[in-house]
Amino acid sequence: MAAPQPLALQLEQLLNPRPREADPEADPEEATRARVIDRFDEGEEEKDDLAVSSIRKLAPVSLLDTDKRYSGKTTSRKAWKEDHWEQALPSSSDNEASDEGGSEDGDSEGLGLEEISEDVDEDLEDNKISDEGGSEDGDSEGLGLEEFSEDVEEDLEGEDEEDREEDRNSEDDGVVAAFSSVKVSEEVEKGRAVKNQIALWDQLLEGRIKLQKALLTTNQLPQPDVFPVFKDKGGPEFASALKNSHKALKALLRSLVDLQEELLFQYPDTRHIVNGAKPNTESEEISSEDDELVGEKKKQRKAPPKRKLEMEDYPSFMAKRFADFTIYRNHTLQKWHDKTKLASGKLGKGFGAFERSILTQIDHIMMDKERLLRRTQTKRSAYRVLGKPEPVPEPVAETLPGEPETLPQGPANAHLRDLDEEIFDDDDFYHQLLRELIERKTSSLDPNDQVAMGRQWLAIQKLRSKIRKKVDRKASKGRKLRFHVLSKLLSFMAPIDHTAMSDDARTELFRSLFGQLNPPDADRGK
């Protein structure tokens, strides 16, 4: 049936005298009305895949309502085994017990074993009442029952074996999963530690690069022999600047000492250097109890005690601190040298110098201390120290045109002779660090790996796109002249006329070329 029309539409149709136009496509019958179907069968489904009828859907419900044999409940394998073994089939007394148990727990058993035992008991009673032939039949029935019980036992044994195998497999899978998860977590932690170490090294190197400019500026300061002259001629302005710089340097030195003490105090193996206690050399590893004690101590004492030292006390204090730290430094260097040596697997191969201990090699290099100090006191950069006269350049001999220019040749090691005990210049070590940084950044990518090279190229393009170009937006539409300043002409000279012809002779020559032989004065007189 069609849906009822609203009251407003019915009233409008009644008040409108104009007859309605019937739609030829409209179908008043509901059975033949065009409808949108929910599903369209294109013949792709198989013919056997038919829908379940309503009778089959109601069949299980009706069977459960009519017969209790089809009723059941969800149970586990273990509970089913216990219930199954409780039903002993060979003896009649057990059958009677099973009958009593079946009458009490008939609703809880859903596997049909109770009905089988009842049928067997009835057959046994019938066999006792019957004749000898019947007794023979009963014996055969008893044999069949024994065979049935044996089959059930074999099935249960097979299921037990399957359960044991499943348990073993699950245990093995759990052990393997736990082992693999531990390995993966360890590798992840190692990777994070290495990443943090590389990031820390990059930050330290960045700080060293920023300190290079300050080091060059420090080397240009006036030295002690001419410093009083600068102080006298500088006046109060120089004195105030000197006082402020002294305070800033003192605060910086205290901050660096506090940072060093904080770092040494946080690590258990170096805490004795700050506390002044004896180092614990019994065990290198730290147990969980020690970690808890360390955490409690940190809560009680978050930082080492602050030291108030004067400027005169810092040299002796730093010398003592360095001597105390040397023991831990040597132990750490030797430990990691041995680990890397074992990991490389090149024991007993190579030169004899590499077979020596790392501490022996360091001591051998530090033996010539005077040479190392001279290397740091050698001026390697081009800068002028205030208060010292500028070096006078050597005069260059004049050369005539056509002769080759000769430059003055100095000794090969002239730059090494420029020694100054009041400066510290390690440009060679600084440039070595820069070279290693550039090599590490550039050689980290495999040249054959096109994907990695493409990613690097995209990163470079992204950085280039971030750079803002300086564009003069007011110079468009002719509002501003655009011009390029030409460079000055160098070695330019006007041409010199070396001809012997005078200007009058040159004029007469050109006039004769065009047929005008009269001189210009005669033309003017006419």
From Swiss-Prot:
Signal peptide: none annotated. Expressed in adrenal gland, brain (Purkinje cells), heart, kidney, liver, lung, muscle, ovary and testis (at the protein level). Residues 339-438 are annotated as: Binds RB1 and SP1. Residues 240-282 are annotated as: Binds POLR2J. It comes from the Eukaryota. It comes from Mus musculus. Keywords: Acetylation, Nucleus, Phosphoprotein. Belongs to the AATF family. It is found in: Nucleus, Nucleolus. GO terms for cellular component: cytoplasm; cytosol; nucleolus; nucleoplasm; nucleus; small-subunit processome; transcription regulator complex. The gene is Aatf. Part of the small subunit (SSU) processome, first precursor of the small eukaryotic ribosomal subunit. During the assembly of the SSU processome in the nucleolus, many ribosome biogenesis factors, an RNA chaperone and ribosomal proteins associate with the nascent pre-rRNA and work in concert to generate RNA folding, modifications, rearrangements and cleavage as well as targeted degradation of pre-ribosomal RNA by the RNA exosome. May function as a general inhibitor of the histone deacetylase HDAC1. This is Protein AATF. One of its GO terms (biological process) is ribosomal small subunit biogenesis. The modification Phosphoserine is found at S62, S170, S240, S283, S287, S288. Residues 283-338 are annotated as: Binds RB1.
